[in-house]
């Protein structure tokens, strides 16, 4: 399955992958067209951001070198884990992922199931969003993924049931961390970890 999923990503197709929270709908993050296909498949407005997902923080830092420094310290303190971190993107890289805020980028480095980790190690960073129709419940299993997304995917990677609670989204672009969405990690814990990384 890993070879099939790698081939699908390299061909510009979407794939359905397990993460540490829910099943994700992913595509090559380095190219605009495959990433935009994710918006079309799930009916998500392109004005709304999606994440750049990788197996390791170093992959994210290589993709967005401006994150080295304060943002990199914060990323290493919180990742890998069930977080989406919103970080500064001064060079406006990966604009197709950033919606109406290209000066910010959301990144994910999950605690991946081994089958997904093996895939990410081969393809680098992916554009990623949850494998549901826009506004629908997050999928904790492949049975929860809509048929139209399965039909539109070039490959599907099954890791069985997942926790089903989405990542906690933390905005780290300002002087103080802000929780934008409470998910798998309680807001108070997320803020405490972020402030601890800043020495506060």
Task: Write out the residue ranges for each language-model feature.
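Active-site-adjacent structural elements in enzyme catalytic cores
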Residues: 1-200
């Amino acid at each position: 399955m890993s070879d099939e999923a790698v081939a699908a990503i390299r061909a510009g197709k979407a794939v359905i992958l397990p993460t540490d929270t829910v099943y994700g709908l992913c595509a090559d993050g380095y190219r605009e067209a495959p990433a935009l296909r994710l918006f079309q498949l799930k009916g998500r407005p392109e004005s709304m951001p999606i994440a750049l997902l990788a197996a390791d923080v170093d992959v994210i830092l290589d993709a967005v070198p401006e994150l080295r420094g304060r943002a990199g310290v914060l990323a290493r303190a919180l990742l890998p884990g069930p977080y989406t971190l919103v970080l500064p993107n001064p060079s406006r890289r990966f604009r197709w992922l950033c919606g109406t805020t290209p000066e910010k980028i959301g990144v994910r480095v999950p605690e991946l199931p081994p089958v997904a980790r093996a895939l990410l190690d081969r393809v680098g960073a992916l554009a990623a969003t949850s494998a549901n129709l826009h506004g629908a419940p997050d999928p904790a299993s492949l049975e929860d993924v809509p048929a139209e997304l399965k039909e539109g995917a070039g490959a599907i990677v099954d890791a069985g049931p997942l926790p089903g609670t989405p990542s906690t989204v933390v905005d780290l672009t300002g002087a103080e961390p802000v929780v934008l969405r409470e998910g798998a990690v309680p807001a108070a814990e997320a803020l405490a970890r972020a402030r601890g990384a800043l020495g506060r």
